[in-house]
């Protein structure tokens, strides 16, 4: 997930409080206000001394010319967290810096600039630094940074097999967020081919809805987490983040509140898209739903061969959850 920093160097209690309530990752404050600020909430503070030096390896570089840009690049490569300040905010210096290092932060004035910064060269800056006196602008930028963090292209795959595979351990992922209708998690036996499993937002004759939950499937399966990485479902636990996606492929990070592993009857679902195989092992229960090619919700007990379902495929393999270009065959 991108990092959100609020610059409160001109200390204002309301600014700091709003930043904390909006989920800021860091707040920049003057050193003489450190003790006062810490009483307002638990958050990471970057302390600025009277000369403007920052703690936690952060450094501000004002870009006026090519030499300044080269200085920023060198500092970032040396491990410094470089906050880029431009006299005339443009994309080009950030493009050049992002191409050379991941330790680049952009100083922004509003949500529009933040949205551009996090999307530059597709991967965007590591975070944004907002300086404003507008409390609502803090909330707007927080929404940009914390909500939609990834966009993937979902495909329509044709179901080729639905096979009962007996009992297995499955993971129900309870998050600290409420899912909307049309949202769920991407899971798969292989990270190269995943199926969109819908959240439990729908009412059922047998059980009440659980709109904070995705019954995600067997413990061995992959799911996506922020940063374009994958983890095994069994690795999810309270406090960790996982990606939620809607039917258009818009992703947002949500926090895991609890991961329940229980033994249940399971189904192997296999599908195909342009010769590529997607598969997942899901619980055999009426409340478990995948998403049809038209956006409809289909219970796994009603799923049939030939049905179209939404999924995701990628070419690269995975090494410790990171995408790599190498030959990997998973069956």
UniProtKB/Swiss-Prot annotation:
Pfam families: DHQS (PF01959)
Top-level EC class: oxidoreductase
Keywords in alphabetical order: Amino-acid biosynthesis, Aromatic amino acid biosynthesis, NAD, Oxidoreductase
GO MF terms, alphabetically ordered: 3-dehydroquinate synthase activity; NAD binding; oxidoreductase activity, acting on the CH-NH2 group of donors, NAD or NADP as acceptor
GO biological process: amino acid biosynthetic process; aromatic amino acid family biosynthetic process
Sequence intervals crossing the membrane: none
EC number: 1.4.1.-
InterPro entries noted in UniProt: DHQ_synth
Superkingdom of the organism of origin: Bacteria
Disulfide bridge map: none
Similarity comment text for this entry: Belongs to the archaeal-type DHQ synthase family.
The protein's name in its UniProt record: 3-dehydroquinate synthase homolog
Annotated organism of origin: Persephonella marina (strain DSM 14350 / EX-H1)
